[in-house]
């Protein structure tokens, strides 16, 4: 394979998007960007990024942020374990590295929530360290470039492609090279039908030459996701909406939600379950069915809307006033059909 860096970087200089992520290329800004973009499209992430950076401009601010306030900043992005790990990492950065992310790939890689790709992106773009940053975009570009049928989700394939990315890397400009590959995959070498006629690497691309770029990369068939019934109780009192805190570990850890049970309950069973926490509810209206898809399971939601007299609640439950629901309690998108994030 001939060198790809020169035409790639020339294309990147002329075509890269003017994004707020690129206006402040500090290690901290890059880290926040990359964590947000792991499960979120660029256009959707921009307002969250700007709000997050305005509220928490450096690792020290992130480390000190109260957990519910942090989750409220993240509300709408989902996958809350990302921001929980960011706070853990920020505290380590403050304790061990003087409040600045370390200019070392292995040290970055050791921080909670930072994998090979994120460590490579921060190390190369912020610090000019010649290490690859291989995400799904880059895997797709190289599968087509080399006309490679290997399963890109297999660890051995990722390792082999990482070697190829490193072999092509200009050691003087690793950051722009990595960003250019990601940008090419996002704008031109897209999933499904790539825009090969616009690609600066078309003359070098073996997949394009073979007429099969749109058939690559090869991925295994997705596994079927298990379906889990969730019964929701949307209960209002004069003090507000009944909320329940989820467990500190596991799915949606530490977030607030309407009282809910991960099983199918009848109206009478739901009334009894609420009575078990001291809430004497009148269930008046069935909730419309809803669905929320996680990476490994599907919640099938339903339940009842009702009212109850305000009462003392056990630990882990609150009556949330409307203004507190908007400002204090982060409710995950899984319940968005019933509780709208403000």
Locate predicted features:
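Intrinsically disordered, low-complexity, charged terminal extensions of DNA damage-control enzymes
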Residues: 1-18, 23, 186-342
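Catalytic cores of DNA base-excision repair glycosylases
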Residues: 2-197, 201-210, 214, 280
